[in-house]
Amino acid sequence: MFPHRFFSVLLFFLLFLAPARSADVEYVWRGVDYQWGSLSNWSVGGIAASSAPGAAASAYEHWMVTNGTDSAGRTDVGGLGAGGRYLKGVRIEGLNSQPEGKIPLFIKNTNKDVYLRVEEGGITVENAGEGGYSADFGVAQLRVAADQEWHVAEGRSLYVGHDDDAPSGGLYSLTSEGDVPRRVTVTGGGAVRIGEGM
């Protein structure tokens, strides 16, 4: 009986001393003018964001989430400064349909030192609900920062790197953070397209 009580107290003591991990933060991107750097395009908990998500100081605590109604467009991470964005994960949950089969949301890049880094939260591409939303997603320069899952729902697409529909004049690559081998598990009935030369 004594050893059991001793280890119970020890476990409680260690849990008490363990540093508290800050909660993940969901940044909702509205995409009205398609610029990451415009804080008017971001909200946190329904209020305006004070900074764009995924800075190095808050590495892998932020999620990029769409709001399902106003996120169609194209944005450039290249103006964010060297190092890029550190995201826990990305959830594309329904976007305005775009004519002529264009990718509703494409994160392009014009700066070779800037990457979109995605950690264990991975990438999810799916419709927010029934109806006229088309939740396709493309990303130019992606660094996989942990083992993760990419879930692409039936009828949806995830484009990584250069593709016929990708914007011209951008940089395209798919790499692993620190060149460490990573495992990416792909689920769902949708399509994942990796560009040429990846």
Predicted regions: what they are:
Residues 1-4:
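N-terminal secretory signal peptides that target proteins for export/translocation
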Residues 6-9, 31:
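Short helix-onset patch at the extreme N-terminus, typifying the N->h transition
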Residues 8-18:
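Bacterial N-terminal signal peptides
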Residues 18-156, 161-180, 187:
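Solvent-exposed adhesion/ligand-recognition segments of exported proteins
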Residues 160, 194-196:
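Extended, compositionally simple hydrophobic/Ser/Thr-rich segments
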Residues 169, 196-197:
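N-terminal leader/targeting segments and the first structural element of proteins
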